[in-house]
């Protein structure tokens, strides 16, 4: 409530002015904008008592009267000037409310008081008078507590060894930030979390040891590396037995990364890392699983998938997406990357082993266009070559001797053959008379015709027997005129189930579906 004495006086800018000479435009004494009334001053902070309300105005029994007449008193003049003569402190003696809040009679009593911004000098004075309990810097303690909680959680889960826990967090946090070597050592002692939110582990390639920090991994490596072959880093506890590994590690310390990607800003220390990075710019997934739809760009990821689920790898693709049958995936091997398949020697390859070789290379066959191809072109060509040599030798043995040539002689095998049923040869006539020589030539030509016809009948009968016995598939009831085609066809039949494809593992119900499968599906 405004007192009756306020009829002729009002508060403006902390001083009393009469309303007789009221001006329309009232300029505040403050150098700030027009909406900020009252001189700038430091607002004191006081503890909230039970007898105080939310507005900050206390009862008249505790403090001086809040009437305008009391504002002109000497005590209030002194209390108003006290913030300028004495430094402001926390929990100091209370002041008059309307001086503290720059009370303006033109504003409602219950409204929020407007406080003008503080000048640079006043802010500096306030900073000097603040007690240390205002906002202490607890960042090192927070980091230290965080590391302690991480150690305790790791020790409870059994992932943190006792050797690592001996190096306390106090030891790590007490190191200087200017010392790069100590900072690196601190980062090596603290476990890291991967992108999946799990603690990153380091597995030993020679035993079952698993470490959660680089420092533990390097200390364990001393067990597998002899002392005369150990190569250590002069700046950190890194240890290896390979010179190029130490060279790459020292490049990381020096910040030297000579290999740079031509498509982005990526840089690395060796060519292998750059090749692995370049796969991220490619859309070809070279490695895939045969048993499911899993595909990846990295060979190591496929090996992990195959070991985890027991699946088999599919054909590896090259950088352009074409199949590479010479590249195989060694699932349980320790060597990084795929392996190049070694080709068997020609003399070691046998026709009997052809159906059981699980090879992917194909060779088109012009006689049977419905076949996508036949496995192992090298062995197939070798088999055809050997068969041609065998057929050529038998043709030379069965060739009829030309008796008109004087240098030829009979062999024991040729003497026992038939000479023809109704002809008799007199050698004396051949040597004495020219006419008889022509007659004998005609006679022997007849003998040659008889022998060729007899041999043809024998070969036809033998071929028919082979078709019925040797070159006939008992599962599909198909007779093959060539041993090569028969061998290739039998290679598609499974060992336990004849209607299971030996190349891809597809099970068919009967011989018709099996024949259609091997005829239509390209086994690449």
UniProtKB/Swiss-Prot annotation:
GO terms, biological process: segmentation
Comp. bias (Basic and acidic residues): 118-127, 138-154, 164-178
PROSITE patterns listed in its UniProt record: ZINC_FINGER_C2H2_1 (PS00028), ZINC_FINGER_C2H2_2 (PS50157)
Biased composition (Polar residues): 76-86
Task performed by this protein: Gap class segmentation protein that controls development of head structures.
Zinc finger (C2H2-type): 202-224, 231-253, 259-281, 298-311, 471-493, 499-523
InterPro entries for this protein: Zinc_finger/UBP_domain (IPR050688), Znf_C2H2_sf (IPR036236), Znf_C2H2_type (IPR013087)
Protein name in the entry: Protein hunchback
One GO MF term: DNA binding
Entry GO CC: nucleus
Keywords for the protein's UniProt record, in alphabetical order: Developmental protein, DNA-binding, Gap protein, Metal-binding, Nucleus, Repeat, Zinc, Zinc-finger
Domain of life (superkingdom): Eukaryota
Regions of compositional bias (Low complexity) in chain numbering: 59-75
PANTHER family according to UniProt: ZINC FINGER PROTEIN (PTHR24403), ZINC FINGER PROTEIN 64 (PTHR24403:SF43)
Location(s), subcellular: Nucleus
């Amino acid at each position: 409530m405004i007192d009756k004495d306020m009829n002729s006086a009002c508060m403006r800018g902390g001083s009393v002015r009469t309303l007789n000479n009221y001006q329309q435009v009232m300029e505040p004494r403050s150098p700030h904008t027009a909406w900020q009334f009252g001189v700038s001053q430091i607002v004191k902070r006081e503890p909230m008592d039970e007898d105080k309300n939310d507005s900050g105005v206390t009862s008249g029994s505790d403090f001086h009267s809040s009437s305008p007449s009391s504002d002109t008193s000497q005590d209030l003049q002194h209390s108003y000037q006290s913030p300028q003569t004495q430094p402001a402190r926390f929990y100091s003696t209370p002041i008059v409310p309307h001086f503290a809040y720059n009370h303006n009679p033109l504003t409602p009593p219950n409204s929020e008081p407007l406080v003008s911004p503080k000048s640079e000098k006043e802010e500096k004075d306030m900073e000097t008078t603040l007690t240390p309990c205002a906002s202490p810097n607890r960042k090192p303690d927070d980091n230290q507590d965080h590391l302690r909680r991480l150690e305790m959680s790791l020790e409870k889960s059994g992932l943190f060894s006792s050797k690592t826990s001996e190096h306390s967090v106090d030891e790590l946090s007490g190191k200087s930030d200017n010392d790069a070597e100590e900072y690196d050592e601190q980062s090596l002692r603290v476990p890291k979390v991967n992108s999946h939110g799990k603690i990153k582990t380091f597995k030993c390639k020679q035993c079952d040891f698993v470490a959660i920090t680089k420092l533990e991994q390097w200390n364990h490596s001393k067990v597998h590396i002899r002392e005369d072959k150990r190569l250590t880093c002069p700046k950190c506890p890194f240890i290896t037995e390979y010179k190029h590994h130490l060279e790459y590690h020292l490049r990381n310390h020096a910040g030297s990364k000579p290999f740079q990607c031509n498509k982005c800003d990526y840089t690395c220390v060796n060519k292998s890392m750059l090749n692995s990075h370049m796969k991220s710019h490619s859309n070809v997934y070279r490695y895939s699983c045969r048993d499911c739809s899993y595909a990846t760009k990295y060979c190591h990821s496929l090996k992990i998938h195959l070991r985890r689920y027991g699946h088999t790898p599919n054909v590896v693709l090259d950088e352009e997406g074409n199949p590479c049958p010479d590249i195989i995936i060694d699932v349980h091997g320790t060597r990084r990357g795929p392996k190049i398949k070694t080709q068997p020697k020609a003399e070691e390859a046998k026709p009997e082993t052809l159906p059981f070789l699980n090879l992917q290379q194909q060779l088109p066959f012009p006689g049977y266009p419905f076949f996508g191809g036949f496995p192992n072109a090298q062995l197939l060509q070798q088999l055809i070559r050997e068969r041609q040599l065998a057929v050529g030798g038998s043709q030379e043995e069965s060739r009829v001797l030309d008796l008109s040539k004087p240098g030829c002689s009979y062999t024991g095998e040729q003497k026992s053959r038939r000479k023809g049923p109704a002809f008799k040869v007199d050698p004396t006539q051949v040597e004495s008379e020219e006419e008889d020589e022509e007659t004998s030539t005609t006679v022997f030509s007849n003998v040659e015709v008889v022998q060729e016809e007899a041999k043809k009948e024998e070969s036809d009968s033998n071929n028919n027997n082979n078709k019925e016995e040797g070159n006939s598939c008992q599962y599909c009831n198909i007779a093959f005129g060539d041993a090569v085609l028969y061998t290739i066809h039998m290679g598609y039949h499974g060992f336990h189930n004849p209607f299971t494809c030996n190349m891809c593992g597809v099970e068919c119900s009967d011989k018709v579906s099996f024949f259609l499968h091997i005829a239509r599906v390209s086994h690449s």
